[in-house]
A protein has these predicted regions:
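Short, small/acidic-rich helices and loops at N termini and domain boundaries
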Residues: 1-89, 399-401, 407-408, 413-414
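Glycine-biased, small-residue-rich flexible motifs in mid-sequence functional cores and linkers
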Residues: 1-6, 84-414
Length: 414
C-alpha cells in the first residue's frame, strides 16, 4: 500500500486519541475502510463508538500533518513500507491471531521474500525470547539454536532486546545471507528509533542479510514500557511457535508465551537447574503444558507437518545446559500482568546486561552459572591462566559462593 490517500487515512485512524483496538475493529466492521470512517456524520459514528470517540474521529489529530509528512519521506527510502489490514502484503499469520495490529511499518530489502512468507507462510517462522540477563550457557544456546533453526530453513523472530533476543538475532545471522531462513526483529518503538542504542549495528546487519525489522508504532515513538508487551503479541502471532530460553518468573517472555498460547501457537521451554532464578518461568511454563525441549531439532520436529515444506533439517543436535531455579505452581495466574509490566519496564530501561547488584561480581562467577561446569570449559570461556582460575575458584569456594563437585566440576551456589 503506497497510495497517499490510503496511507493518510490509516495513519489518521491510528493516531486518533481514545480509539483503541476494539473500537477500531468495530469501526472497520461497520464502514470497511478508514477513509469511509472519516466521511461519516457524528450520529453515524456514535452508533458504533462513544460520543467522545466520535468527536475525536471528526477532528484531525494533533501533529497529524507533520506525522504524515515524516511518513511519506520515510517511505521514499528503499526497502521501507507501510502495510495495513487488508493489504495483500499483510502477514496472514497475524490476521489469524487474536489481536492483529492495525498497520505495520516495515524495513526489508527483499520484498519478494517478505511477500512469500506473508502470503504463503513459507519459510515458516519461529519466535525466540528469553532473559535480558542470560547466563553464558543460555546466551550460547540461544545463538546456537537460532543458527541451527535458520540453517534448517526457518526464520527466527525476536525483539532486538538485550540478552537472548540479541543472541537469537546473531545466531540467525550466521546462516547464509539472503537464504530462506533469516532474522526478523519486532520492535517496540518507531522504526526511526533503535532501542537499545547499542543494537544499531545489529539492526543494520539484519537488514543487510535480507531480514526484516517491523513495528506497529508510528515513526518517532520512543521506548515506552507499555509498548513492549504489545510488541510481544506480534512475535507470538507471526510464528508457528515460541521458544523460551531462561525466563524468570516475572519475565516479559512469559507474556509472549501466554499470548502465543492464546493464539494457538506452540510454546517450547528449555529446562535448567532448579537452583537458578532464571529457570522459574521456563519450569512453570512446562508445568502448564509447554513442550520441554533439549535441542533445536526437537523444536523443529515438534511443529505441524504442513510447516515442513522446503525445510532442510539440520543434523547437529546441540544439547542444552542451562541455569535455573525451582519454579512455582502457576506463573500466569499467580503473577499479575501488572507486576510483569513493572518488571518489563525495569528491564527495558537498562542499558547494560548487568544490573547494579551484579556489576561487582567477578567474570568467573558470572561465567559459572548454576549448572555444573568443568575447569576446561571455564578456561575456554575466560581469559584466565589455569593457576589464576584455580586460585579464584578456591576463593569463591571459601566464600561459600561456589561448590566443588565430583568429577572436577564446579557449580555456583548464590
Amino acid at each position: 500500500m503506497q497510495h497517499r490517500g490510503d496511507i493518510a487515512a490509516w495513519l489518521r485512524l491510528q493516531l486518533t486519541p481514545g480509539v483503541g483496538a476494539v473500537s477500531t475493529r468495530r469501526l472497520l466492521a461497520a464502514f470497511s475502510l478508514p477513509d469511509q470512517i472519516f466521511r461519516q456524520s457524528q450520529s453515524a459514528l456514535e452508533a458504533v463508538v462513544s460520543e467522545k470517540q466520535a468527536k475525536a474521529l471528526l477532528r484531525e489529530p494533533v501533529g497529524f500533518s507533520v506525522a504524515l509528512q515524516n511518513l511519506e519521506g520515510w517511505l521514499n527510502q528503499n526497502g521501507q513500507r507501510f502495510v495495513a489490514l487488508g493489504d495483500p502484503d499483510y502477514p496472514q499469520s497475524l490476521l489469524q491471531s487474536p489481536d492483529p495490529p492495525l498497520c505495520l511499518y516495515v524495513q526489508c530489502a527483499d520484498w519478494q521474500w517478505w511477500q512469500l512468507w506473508a502470503k504463503e507462510k513459507q519459510p515458516p517462522l519461529l519466535g525466540m525470547v528469553g532473559s535480558r540477563k542470560p547466563s553464558p550457557q543460555g546466551e550460547r544456546t540461544a545463538q546456537t539454536w537460532a543458527k541451527e533453526i535458520t540453517q534448517s530453513g526457518f526464520s527466527v523472530i525476536s525483539g532486538l532486546a538485550l540478552g537472548v533476543d540479541a543472541a537469537a538475532h546473531k545466531g540467525a545471522l550466521q546462516a547464509p545471507a539472503w537464504g530462506m531462513g533469516r532474522s526478523i526483529a519486532v520492535v517496540g518503538t518507531g522504526l526511526d528509533v533503535v532501542y537499545p542504542r547499542q543494537h544499531t549495528q545489529l539492526a543494520q546487519e539484519i537488514l543487510n542479510a535480507g531480514g526484516a525489522i517491523l513495528s506497529e508504532f508510528p515513526l518517532g515513538t520512543p521506548a515506552i514500557a507499555t509498548n513492549f508487551p504489545k510488541r510481544n503479541r506480534i512475535i507470538a502471532g507471526l510464528g508457528l511457535g515460541v521458544v523460551v530460553i531462561e525466563a524468570a518468573l516475572q519475565s516479559g517472555s512469559l507474556i509472549t508465551a501466554r499470548l502465543a498460547m492464546e493464539a494457538n501457537r506452540e510454546v517450547f521451554a528449555l529446562p535448567g537447574s532448579i537452583y537458578s532464578p532464571q529457570s522459574q518461568g521456563c519450569h512453570a511454563l512446562i508445568k502448564q503444558g509447554a513442550q520441554l525441549v533439549e535441542s533445536a531439532q526437537e523444536v523443529i520436529q515438534a511443529l505441524p507437518p504442513q510447516s515442513m515444506l522446503g525445510v532442510n533439517f539440520a543434523t547437529n543436535n546441540i544439547a542444552f545446559e542451562a541455569d535455573k531455579k525451582k519454579s512455582p505452581e502457576d506463573p500466569l495466574s499467580t503473577v499479575t500482568q501488572k507486576s510483569m509490566l513493572k518488571k518489563e519496564k525495569e528491564k527495558e530501561s537498562q542499558t547494560t546486561v548487568l544490573s547494579k547488584g551484579s556489576e561487582k561480581e567477578s567474570p568467573l562467577l558470572l561465567a559459572l552459572g548454576f549448572a555444573p561446569i568443568s575447569l576446561e570449559a571455564l578456561l575456554l570461556e575466560l581469559s584466565y591462566s589455569a593457576a589464576e582460575l584455580q586460585m579464584e575458584l578456591l576463593q569463591l569456594e571459601l566464600a561459600g559462593k561456589v561448590s566443588r563437585l565430583p568429577g572436577g566440576l564446579y557449580q555456583r551456589l548464590i
